[in-house]
Amino acid sequence: MTDPGNSLRIEPQPWMVESATLAVLDALAAVGVVARFVGGSVRDALLGRPIGDIDIATPAPPQRVMELLEKRGIKVVPTGLAHGTVTAIAGTPPRHFEITTLRRDVETYGRRARVVFDADWAADAARRDFTINAIFLDPDGTLHDPVGGLADLRACRVRFVGDPATRIAEDVLRILRYYRFEARFGSGLGDPPARAACRAMANLLPNLSAERVAQELVKLLDASDPVPALRMMQEDAVLSVILQEARRLDRLQHMIAIEPEPDPLRRLAALIEVDGPAAGAIAERLRFSNAWRDRLEGLAVPWPLDPRADDRAQRRALYRLGAERYRDLALLQAAEGSVSRERLAELLAIARDWTPPVFPIAGRDITALGIPPGPRVGRLLDAVHFWWETGDFIADRAACLAYLQGLPPPPY
């Protein structure tokens, strides 16, 4: 962590002084508007992690912010005027700045709230979700920490701002966000008041849209090690509400230890123990894309890969399954414990080094022999393809045509 010591000040980071950031800040400062960085960019900068989009807080009302930015030729999108939020897009490549007016939430209705804009930085911090997201940073590097986020960041502690139950009632998704933040920033132990509130209010999770649940689940699974947070979710009776099929934390832990890179969908396949139709039902329930649904179904048990077969059989499996599915299945077998580390390395090397060839003939080669289009063409093509595949893909076009001409004509 970039430690500010007792001065509550850090050296300005490169992202704070890049041209796009300065253009946005200068547009606001030109008329004396105060602007401070806040949220994930500040948190991640203090941890020395890469940052993405930049959040900025200001007392200026959103219409005034838009006017000042547009006057400088900066593109502005009114992403949430009712809640005081606009998005500025500046720089090359484009950088997004979410600029939100300081506010107090007067009434909340789930995700929605009736807000009042004001100039009270402490009140704005008090309405945020977690203390580590409520640290303000001036452009000169001065930190403002009204709710103790710096101490929590140092201690790897994820804590709600104020009363956890109140924060969750404002948006139930914060239950899932809490565990995701535990996976990214926590110690693995959890904050007892936060966990107690999540446990008590888990029955509200079915009210969330499937898309929001899926987004949080995928982000959680993409953490470097999500298992401690998932175990907390299991202990707190939260995981069973959103994914009752998640029973294989042991296999997921092994997957994380052997995988070459994180893959949230492959990790999900390791976490659940279901057949293809059940995997498809999970994907439908979570509103996954068709591609993700097909991929998850393809990684369901029973696994169509025998890791003990010889290399010739592995090439045939790789040809039929495709490289991505073959690698995923090999990793799942290893995570299950049925493949040694050494054998896994061999299987992954086959997938890396062998390029499946293209079948050298097509239906037109059969019709050129005088066989009319129809089922006979397909049966003959399948016969040659099977011979070519079982022969380890060695036969070239001439050999395939010779084999074709030697086949007896199939029955109608």
For every predicted segment, state its role.
Residues 1-412:
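Catalytic cores of the polymerase beta-like nucleotidyltransferase superfamily
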